[in-house]
């Protein structure tokens, strides 16, 4: 059997052979120290053209964190690796420290990656087994139980984990052989954290009883990943048929699916939008409280910073925008008006809606969220605002996002949608053409 050095080099060649720019997540601990040492040797022995960079994240959670940066800097200087560090602030109020720290790390990785550069991290076989058990604890399905893939799409590039098939014990042997120095994070002994609890108390028992357990758990994770990939392939065409150009999901076709297929399609719809996978309970609530709500209702269900809404027999993922109902903007129509909340800007242009020029005593303002009866050009009778929006096909969540042009207290137009009869000019009077340049609406 090949020694650990040879096996690791073969793994690196398989995963990294074609990549010339590599960013390494470098904590200074055992795992990432082994990974960086391997990459440096691989660069030196096999491909001098490789651009190797290391990034260290200062989480601000340990009094020794500043010393760890110095340690990592010295290692990188000695190994001739370009070194970067970044400080992050951890907000553990919603997710807990472990998840919040991980999210913060990967946000830094995402912002630090350069063009054509791949990210390489040092998770190993024991990490994979722990991740599998944590997913099992949460009641995850195949997608969660698949744990960490060795290669994944990340930030328009790839995230590679070349050590996933190697145990911590093997990495320790490699580090000892090459006399590596690494950081020991004392917080790893705090079993209040779930992963540490597994590592300190559960994994030793499992390994003592079944020495093959980490490999078996990793194999199960891999099989779950294969099942999830197969489902993706089988459901891809169905999902394409259900999703509209606006990213909404058709309810009628979903209704004839089995519950299992419907839930699988709903999960993939969330994935299509880059959202976290919903739980079984959330899927049930989404279907029965939103999709199947009574026809005259305007149901919504919150998912993080988004709401799932129903409109025209489709499900929509809608950002939770700030209310603009109380917003009143003065507008000197000679100048461009920048709208709030990234809605774009208004100006006088060659194309757009036409309205009369305001009188000298008329104050021009932009408001949001009209209520009451409205009489628009092209309609004989006035309509209540809610009824009018419905007739014009404007989704409920967009109605408060459309700029309303007022002269004094008189509604003149909803930009891009309608003009009222009060917008019409007397014969011979000048007209203005107003344009709404939209940057974000849906």
UniProtKB/Swiss-Prot annotation:
It is an enzyme of class 6 (ligase). GO terms for cellular component: cytoplasm. One of its GO terms (biological process) is tRNA modification. Its main location: cytoplasm. ATP binds at residues 27-32. Belongs to the tRNA(Ile)-lysidine synthase family. This is tRNA(Ile)-lysidine synthase. It comes from Photorhabdus laumondii subsp. laumondii (strain DSM 15139 / CIP 105565 / TT01) (Photorhabdus luminescens subsp. laumondii).
